[in-house]
Amino acid sequence: MKLVIDAGNTNIVFAVHDGSRWRGTWRIATDAQRTSDEYGVWLTVLLDRAGIAAGGIDGAVIGTVVPAALYHLRRLCRDWFSLEPLIARAELDWGFAIEMDNPAEIGADRLLNALAAHHGYGGPLIVIDFGTATTFDVVNGNGAYVGGVIAPGINLSVEALHQAAARLPRIGIGRPQLVIGKSTIPAMRSGIYWGYVGLVEGLIARIEADFGAPMKTIATGGLAPLIAEGTSRIEHTDPDLTLEGLRLLALRNPAPVLRPREAEHE
């Protein structure tokens, strides 16, 4: 069984795959100061409740866009599971070309989404990830990663609106039935929701125009189903896309070997 860890700016997702299916997924808020022992106690309790023996986990892979969290996640794998984790990075064997000026600067989550989306849906395609940032990643028909777009995330935009305008409250995100709001909060909700639907539709159209052909569109991230309700341009939503990318990456790359000194506490 493989321990798969997807560390984002907002949440860290832990999952276990037994070679045929996901046995469980668990989510915790990202905190760069949380120690490996805190992760270990929390995770082993959840594994036990799911009937998963920690000793049966024989591999680990980590994808993170939070460098400060990597140290403790690596120590978790070493100290609690006696494993040296594979760390997702551009230099690994992805099975596709990365056609970027500086591949090393690309967030691992974007490459992982591209890997899983092309494997599951074929190309050419656009992967949209509704996270802290809203990213659009483009994969051609041969599976090569050819670039993308980064826009502010929905929650980030909501918070910025509240912080910058003293009289605008902090609001929840939902789909308004009407575009024209009759008071402040409905007007804000409409601007956020339908504004992001418009951003999605507009960027898909512009990406396809640049690419020169229609493309499949796959969305992931917590808000993907909600945004997909408002547009026909999102063809599939896949909540486990990044986890699946990590699983596939681990299949393509040999597991690192845990050296004795790495198993000791630093």
Curated annotation (Swiss-Prot):
It catalyses: (R)-pantothenate + ATP = (R)-4'-phosphopantothenate + ADP + H(+). The active site is at D109 (proton acceptor). Pathway: Cofactor biosynthesis; coenzyme A biosynthesis; CoA from (R)-pantothenate: step 1/5. Homodimer. Belongs to the type III pantothenate kinase family. Catalyzes the phosphorylation of pantothenate (Pan), the first step in CoA biosynthesis. It is found in: Cytoplasm. Its EC number is 2.7.1.33. One of its GO terms (molecular function) is pantothenate kinase activity. The gene is coaX. Keywords: ATP-binding, Coenzyme A biosynthesis, Cytoplasm, Kinase, Metal-binding, Nucleotide-binding, Potassium, Transferase. ATP binds at D6, A7, G8, N9, T10, N11, I12, V13, T132. The keyword Nucleotide-binding applies. This is Type III pantothenate kinase. One of its GO terms (biological process) is coenzyme A biosynthetic process. Pfam families: Pan_kinase. K(+) binds at D129. A monovalent cation. Ammonium or potassium. Substrate binds at G107, A108, D109, R110, T184.
